[in-house]
């Protein structure tokens, strides 16, 4: 039986309407909002044959679990996604670019990581099934639409999954504050999986041991570490820069 979930906010729902319109079943909206953005949104939802339901602010708050829903909430069917590494890799054309997250439990950080992954053209974000943030409505809203465009694959054992990626010819590069090699001194223009640990805790030991190499982002100021989404963006776009330079 298909799983249902709720999304809220214009970006998350609009991205789903554009990417998987048939999965949007119902849309609750605030009729008090009659601006151009709401009109365009409702037109898009109606074009997808979603059922439109007028709802007041208290109803929208109850549905979304928060007040920052922008006046729109949608009930959607889970989109079909890759359920295994093998399936994921079979869908990728060209050199894979993957982001793996180890121990990232904050849904807002997950959403931000999905957003930078989308911006860099990454093919997927991978995380362990346990001790990791789920793809909740809060994560989807923070992703600003990227949760509907970037596959989020959860695996039982992240270290084992990384070894499988290596066996498939994908270079696995981890990041850590105590690494001696700089991110900017390593070749990243091939098939690549970048592994990010949680801020503070970093990668777990087995995850780190599964990496081909571990690098650091050189910091010139006084802070000791970066937010995981910021660090992910730096690493992903360095890989993109090297790929473009090679062309």
UniProtKB/Swiss-Prot annotation:
One Gene Ontology term of the molecular function aspect: RNA binding
Keyword terms: Cytoplasm, Methyltransferase, rRNA processing, S-adenosyl-L-methionine, Transferase
Primary localization class, coarse: cytoplasm
Binding site for S-adenosyl-L-methionine: 197, 217, 226
Catalytic activity: guanosine(2251) in 23S rRNA + S-adenosyl-L-methionine = 2'-O-methylguanosine(2251) in 23S rRNA + S-adenosyl-L-homocysteine + H(+)
Recorded GO CC terms: cytosol
Gene3D superfamilies (UniProt xref): 3.30.1330.30, 3.40.1280.10
CDD domains named among the record's database cross-references: SpoU-like_RlmB
Keyword flag Cytoplasm: yes
Subcellular location: Cytoplasm
HAMAP family for this protein: 23SrRNA_methyltr_B
Functional note: Specifically methylates the ribose of guanosine 2251 in 23S rRNA.
Annotated protein name in UniProt: 23S rRNA (guanosine-2'-O-)-methyltransferase RlmB
Organism name: Burkholderia sp
Taxonomic path: Bacteria, Pseudomonadati, Pseudomonadota, Betaproteobacteria, Burkholderiales
Protein encoded by which gene: rlmB
